[in-house]
Amino acid sequence: MTMFQKLVAIEPVSLIPSAEQELSRYAQQVELFADIPADDDEIVRRIGDADAVLLSYTSRIGREVIECCPKIRYIGMCCSLYSEQSANVDIAFAREKGIRVLGIRDYGDRGVVEYVLHELIGLLHGFGMPMLQDEPVEITGLKVGIVGLGVSGKMIADALAFMGAEVSYYSRSRKPEAEAAGMSYKPLDALLKDSQVVFTCLNKNVLLLGQPEFEQLGAGKVLFNTSIGPGFDSAALERWLDQPGTHFFCDTRAAAGAVAEGFFDRDNVHCQNVSAGRTKQAFVLLSQKVLANIRTVLAELE
Protein backbone atom coordinates (compact mmCIF):
# COMPACT_ATOMS: atom_id res chain seq x y z
CA MET A 1 0.00 0.00 0.00
CA THR A 2 1.16 3.51 -0.81
CA MET A 3 2.31 5.45 2.26
CA PHE A 4 3.37 8.98 2.97
CA GLN A 5 7.03 9.45 3.80
CA LYS A 6 6.33 11.71 6.75
CA LEU A 7 3.09 12.91 8.34
CA VAL A 8 3.11 15.84 10.75
CA ALA A 9 0.27 17.19 12.88
CA ILE A 10 1.40 20.76 13.46
CA GLU A 11 -0.86 21.17 16.51
CA PRO A 12 -3.33 19.16 18.62
CA VAL A 13 -5.91 17.74 16.22
CA SER A 14 -8.26 15.93 18.65
CA LEU A 15 -7.69 12.40 17.37
CA ILE A 16 -8.52 9.62 19.81
CA PRO A 17 -5.51 7.45 20.87
CA SER A 18 -6.36 4.53 18.57
CA ALA A 19 -6.56 6.91 15.61
CA GLU A 20 -3.18 8.42 16.47
CA GLN A 21 -1.73 4.91 16.47
CA GLU A 22 -3.38 4.11 13.14
CA LEU A 23 -1.55 6.99 11.49
CA SER A 24 1.54 4.77 11.46
CA ARG A 25 -0.21 2.58 8.89
CA TYR A 26 -0.30 5.48 6.47
CA ALA A 27 3.10 7.14 6.93
CA GLN A 28 6.61 5.83 7.47
CA GLN A 29 7.22 8.57 10.03
CA VAL A 30 4.62 10.31 12.19
CA GLU A 31 5.16 13.39 14.34
CA LEU A 32 2.41 14.90 16.47
CA PHE A 33 2.92 18.28 18.13
CA ALA A 34 1.14 18.93 21.42
CA ASP A 35 0.91 22.73 21.27
CA ILE A 36 -0.22 25.40 18.83
CA PRO A 37 2.55 26.96 16.71
CA ALA A 38 3.21 30.60 17.45
CA ASP A 39 3.62 31.81 13.86
CA ASP A 40 4.23 30.83 10.24
CA ASP A 41 7.94 30.31 10.82
CA GLU A 42 7.16 27.73 13.49
CA ILE A 43 4.63 26.02 11.22
CA VAL A 44 7.23 25.78 8.45
CA ARG A 45 9.77 24.39 10.90
CA ARG A 46 7.35 21.77 12.14
CA ILE A 47 6.35 20.68 8.64
CA GLY A 48 9.93 20.49 7.41
CA ASP A 49 10.18 17.79 4.73
CA ALA A 50 6.81 16.20 5.48
CA ASP A 51 4.60 15.23 2.56
CA ALA A 52 1.42 15.03 4.66
CA VAL A 53 0.22 17.64 7.15
CA LEU A 54 -2.66 17.70 9.62
CA LEU A 55 -4.00 20.80 11.35
CA SER A 56 -7.03 21.84 13.39
CA TYR A 57 -8.97 25.13 13.42
CA THR A 58 -6.45 26.96 15.62
CA SER A 59 -3.75 27.52 12.96
CA ARG A 60 -3.64 28.57 9.33
CA ILE A 61 -1.60 27.24 6.43
CA GLY A 62 -1.43 30.04 3.90
CA ARG A 63 0.43 30.64 0.67
CA GLU A 64 3.68 31.60 2.41
CA VAL A 65 3.81 28.36 4.39
CA ILE A 66 2.99 26.24 1.35
CA GLU A 67 5.71 27.95 -0.70
CA CYS A 68 8.28 27.11 1.98
CA CYS A 69 7.30 23.42 2.17
CA PRO A 70 7.63 22.02 -1.36
CA LYS A 71 7.28 18.37 -0.39
CA ILE A 72 3.69 18.62 0.83
CA ARG A 73 1.29 16.40 -1.11
CA TYR A 74 -1.63 16.37 1.30
CA ILE A 75 -3.10 18.74 3.88
CA GLY A 76 -5.76 17.25 6.14
CA MET A 77 -8.02 19.64 8.01
CA CYS A 78 -9.15 18.01 11.26
CA CYS A 79 -11.92 20.57 11.51
CA SER A 80 -14.95 21.69 9.57
CA LEU A 81 -14.44 22.69 5.95
CA TYR A 82 -17.45 24.70 4.80
CA SER A 83 -15.99 26.49 1.78
CA GLU A 84 -12.65 27.47 0.28
CA GLN A 85 -13.26 31.09 1.21
CA SER A 86 -13.73 30.37 4.91
CA ALA A 87 -11.07 27.66 5.21
CA ASN A 88 -7.92 28.09 7.31
CA VAL A 89 -5.90 26.63 4.43
CA ASP A 90 -5.21 28.45 1.15
CA ILE A 91 -6.90 25.72 -0.85
CA ALA A 92 -6.72 27.53 -4.19
CA PHE A 93 -2.94 27.96 -3.96
CA ALA A 94 -2.53 24.41 -2.71
CA ARG A 95 -4.41 23.21 -5.79
CA GLU A 96 -2.01 25.17 -8.01
CA LYS A 97 0.84 23.27 -6.36
CA GLY A 98 -0.86 19.91 -6.86
CA ILE A 99 -1.58 19.52 -3.14
CA ARG A 100 -4.76 17.71 -2.13
CA VAL A 101 -6.71 19.35 0.72
CA LEU A 102 -9.57 17.61 2.50
CA GLY A 103 -11.59 18.65 5.52
CA ILE A 104 -14.45 17.13 7.47
CA ARG A 105 -18.06 18.02 8.26
CA ASP A 106 -20.88 17.07 10.58
CA TYR A 107 -19.10 15.47 13.50
CA GLY A 108 -20.20 17.59 16.47
CA ASP A 109 -23.80 18.42 15.68
CA ARG A 110 -25.52 16.22 18.27
CA GLY A 111 -23.75 18.00 21.11
CA VAL A 112 -24.93 21.32 19.73
CA VAL A 113 -28.54 20.14 19.70
CA GLU A 114 -28.23 19.00 23.31
CA TYR A 115 -26.73 22.39 24.27
CA VAL A 116 -29.63 24.23 22.63
CA LEU A 117 -32.26 22.13 24.40
CA HIS A 118 -30.49 22.50 27.75
CA GLU A 119 -30.24 26.29 27.57
CA LEU A 120 -33.65 26.89 26.04
CA ILE A 121 -35.44 24.73 28.61
CA GLY A 122 -33.47 26.46 31.37
CA LEU A 123 -34.67 29.85 30.15
CA LEU A 124 -38.28 28.81 29.66
CA HIS A 125 -38.54 27.16 33.09
CA GLY A 126 -36.08 29.30 35.04
CA PHE A 127 -33.69 26.44 35.70
CA GLY A 128 -30.41 28.07 36.75
CA MET A 129 -31.28 31.42 35.19
CA PRO A 130 -34.06 34.04 35.26
CA MET A 131 -37.28 32.78 33.69
CA LEU A 132 -38.19 34.23 30.29
CA GLN A 133 -41.82 34.89 31.24
CA ASP A 134 -43.74 35.27 34.50
CA GLU A 135 -44.46 31.54 34.67
CA PRO A 136 -42.83 28.40 33.25
CA VAL A 137 -43.64 27.63 29.63
CA GLU A 138 -43.00 24.59 27.47
CA ILE A 139 -41.41 24.41 24.05
CA THR A 140 -44.85 23.33 22.81
CA GLY A 141 -46.29 26.16 20.72
CA LEU A 142 -43.08 28.22 20.85
CA LYS A 143 -42.50 30.14 17.62
CA VAL A 144 -38.98 29.25 16.53
CA GLY A 145 -37.03 30.58 13.54
CA ILE A 146 -33.98 28.80 12.12
CA VAL A 147 -31.61 30.89 10.01
CA GLY A 148 -29.58 28.43 7.93
CA LEU A 149 -31.08 24.98 7.49
CA GLY A 150 -27.92 22.96 6.96
CA VAL A 151 -27.17 19.77 8.86
CA SER A 152 -27.00 21.29 12.35
CA GLY A 153 -29.84 23.73 11.68
CA LYS A 154 -32.08 20.89 10.49
CA MET A 155 -31.19 18.78 13.54
CA ILE A 156 -32.11 21.67 15.85
CA ALA A 157 -35.32 22.24 13.91
CA ASP A 158 -36.25 18.55 14.08
CA ALA A 159 -35.61 18.39 17.83
CA LEU A 160 -37.71 21.48 18.55
CA ALA A 161 -40.48 20.34 16.22
CA PHE A 162 -40.56 17.02 18.06
CA MET A 163 -41.06 18.99 21.28
CA GLY A 164 -44.02 20.81 19.74
CA ALA A 165 -42.48 24.09 18.57
CA GLU A 166 -43.84 25.94 15.54
CA VAL A 167 -40.74 25.98 13.33
CA SER A 168 -40.05 28.31 10.42
CA TYR A 169 -36.80 28.64 8.54
CA TYR A 170 -34.83 30.91 6.23
CA SER A 171 -32.20 29.45 3.93
CA ARG A 172 -30.50 30.26 0.63
CA SER A 173 -32.65 27.58 -0.99
CA ARG A 174 -36.03 26.12 -0.16
CA LYS A 175 -35.99 22.77 1.64
CA PRO A 176 -38.94 20.66 0.42
CA GLU A 177 -38.26 17.89 2.92
CA ALA A 178 -38.46 20.38 5.81
CA GLU A 179 -41.68 21.85 4.50
CA ALA A 180 -43.12 18.36 4.06
CA ALA A 181 -42.38 17.83 7.76
CA GLY A 182 -44.45 20.89 8.67
CA MET A 183 -41.78 23.61 8.78
CA SER A 184 -42.57 26.91 7.07
CA TYR A 185 -40.23 28.89 4.83
CA LYS A 186 -40.23 32.62 5.51
CA PRO A 187 -38.19 35.53 4.17
CA LEU A 188 -35.63 36.66 6.73
CA ASP A 189 -37.46 39.82 7.76
CA ALA A 190 -40.72 37.95 8.37
CA LEU A 191 -38.97 35.17 10.28
CA LEU A 192 -37.27 37.66 12.59
CA LYS A 193 -40.50 39.56 13.21
CA ASP A 194 -42.66 36.48 13.82
CA SER A 195 -40.32 34.27 15.89
CA GLN A 196 -39.97 34.29 19.66
CA VAL A 197 -36.65 32.44 19.54
CA VAL A 198 -34.21 32.62 16.61
CA PHE A 199 -31.24 30.36 15.92
CA THR A 200 -28.44 31.36 13.55
CA CYS A 201 -26.85 28.17 12.17
CA LEU A 202 -24.59 29.61 9.49
CA ASN A 203 -21.33 28.72 7.83
CA LYS A 204 -18.19 30.44 9.05
CA ASN A 205 -17.84 34.09 7.95
CA VAL A 206 -21.48 34.34 6.78
CA LEU A 207 -22.99 37.50 8.31
CA LEU A 208 -26.75 37.96 7.84
CA LEU A 209 -27.94 40.09 10.74
CA GLY A 210 -27.13 43.79 10.78
CA GLN A 211 -28.85 46.75 12.39
CA PRO A 212 -31.98 46.53 10.17
CA GLU A 213 -32.39 42.84 10.95
CA PHE A 214 -32.05 43.37 14.70
CA GLU A 215 -34.68 46.10 14.48
CA GLN A 216 -36.98 43.56 12.82
CA LEU A 217 -36.22 41.06 15.58
CA GLY A 218 -37.17 43.60 18.23
CA ALA A 219 -37.52 43.45 22.00
CA GLY A 220 -38.56 40.48 24.09
CA LYS A 221 -36.84 37.94 21.84
CA VAL A 222 -34.18 35.27 22.26
CA LEU A 223 -31.24 34.71 19.90
CA PHE A 224 -29.03 31.63 19.83
CA ASN A 225 -25.89 31.55 17.69
CA THR A 226 -24.67 27.99 17.11
CA SER A 227 -22.23 28.97 14.35
CA ILE A 228 -18.46 28.83 14.83
CA GLY A 229 -18.24 32.61 14.49
CA PRO A 230 -20.74 35.45 14.61
CA GLY A 231 -23.53 35.41 12.03
CA PHE A 232 -24.25 39.07 12.71
CA ASP A 233 -22.78 42.51 13.21
CA SER A 234 -21.60 42.37 16.82
CA ALA A 235 -22.17 46.07 17.48
CA ALA A 236 -25.75 45.72 16.29
CA LEU A 237 -26.14 42.71 18.60
CA GLU A 238 -25.03 44.79 21.58
CA ARG A 239 -27.50 47.56 20.77
CA TRP A 240 -30.28 44.98 20.44
CA LEU A 241 -29.44 43.55 23.87
CA ASP A 242 -30.10 46.96 25.42
CA GLN A 243 -33.80 46.40 24.71
CA PRO A 244 -35.99 44.82 27.42
CA GLY A 245 -36.58 41.09 27.47
CA THR A 246 -33.79 40.18 25.07
CA HIS A 247 -31.46 37.22 25.59
CA PHE A 248 -28.42 35.99 23.67
CA PHE A 249 -26.91 32.50 23.90
CA CYS A 250 -23.65 31.14 22.47
CA ASP A 251 -21.48 28.23 23.52
CA THR A 252 -18.10 29.92 22.97
CA ARG A 253 -17.04 33.55 23.23
CA ALA A 254 -15.79 33.48 19.64
CA ALA A 255 -19.39 33.04 18.53
CA ALA A 256 -20.20 36.55 19.77
CA GLY A 257 -17.56 38.20 17.60
CA ALA A 258 -15.76 41.44 18.43
CA VAL A 259 -17.83 42.65 21.36
CA ALA A 260 -17.07 45.33 23.93
CA GLU A 261 -15.36 44.64 27.23
CA GLY A 262 -17.91 43.54 29.78
CA PHE A 263 -20.24 42.04 27.17
CA PHE A 264 -20.25 38.62 28.84
CA ASP A 265 -21.06 40.19 32.21
CA ARG A 266 -24.49 41.24 30.96
CA ASP A 267 -27.37 39.48 32.71
CA ASN A 268 -29.00 38.69 29.36
CA VAL A 269 -25.88 37.16 27.77
CA HIS A 270 -25.44 33.44 28.39
CA CYS A 271 -22.15 31.86 27.34
CA GLN A 272 -20.73 28.61 28.71
CA ASN A 273 -17.46 29.28 26.83
CA VAL A 274 -17.19 25.58 26.01
CA SER A 275 -17.65 24.23 22.50
CA ALA A 276 -20.84 22.19 22.71
CA GLY A 277 -19.85 20.02 19.78
CA ARG A 278 -16.60 18.79 21.28
CA THR A 279 -17.84 15.62 22.97
CA LYS A 280 -16.41 12.14 23.40
CA GLN A 281 -18.59 10.86 20.58
CA ALA A 282 -17.66 13.79 18.34
CA PHE A 283 -13.94 13.06 18.73
CA VAL A 284 -14.57 9.45 17.67
CA LEU A 285 -16.45 10.59 14.58
CA LEU A 286 -13.83 13.26 13.84
CA SER A 287 -11.09 10.63 14.03
CA GLN A 288 -12.95 8.28 11.70
CA LYS A 289 -13.41 11.01 9.11
CA VAL A 290 -9.80 12.20 9.31
CA LEU A 291 -8.50 8.66 8.76
CA ALA A 292 -10.97 8.07 5.92
CA ASN A 293 -9.67 11.21 4.17
CA ILE A 294 -6.09 9.97 4.47
CA ARG A 295 -7.06 6.61 2.97
CA THR A 296 -8.86 8.39 0.13
CA VAL A 297 -5.79 10.44 -0.78
CA LEU A 298 -3.41 7.49 -0.58
CA ALA A 299 -5.71 5.52 -2.89
CA GLU A 300 -5.58 8.40 -5.37
CA LEU A 301 -1.77 8.40 -5.22
CA GLU A 302 -1.43 4.69 -6.06
Predicted regions and their residues:
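C-terminal helix-to-coil terminal segments
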Residues: 2, 18-22, 95, 100-112, ...
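NAD(P)-binding Rossmann-fold cofactor-contacting core
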Residues: 162-179
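N-terminal glycine-/charge-rich "phosphate-binding" loop or analogous flexible N-terminal tail
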Residues: 1-50, 164, 168
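Glycine-rich NAD(P)-binding loop of Rossmann-like domains
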Residues: 126-156
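Phosphate-coordination loops involved in phosphoryl transfer and adenosine-cofactor binding
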Residues: 4, 72, 140-143, 220
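Phosphate/diphosphate ligand-binding glycine-rich loop within oxidoreductases
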Residues: 50-131
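A short helix->loop->beta-strand "cap" motif at the edges of active sites that frequently abuts
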Residues: 69-74, 97-99, 165, 219-221, ...
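Rossmann-like adenosine-cofactor binding region
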Residues: 48-51, 61-65, 174-262
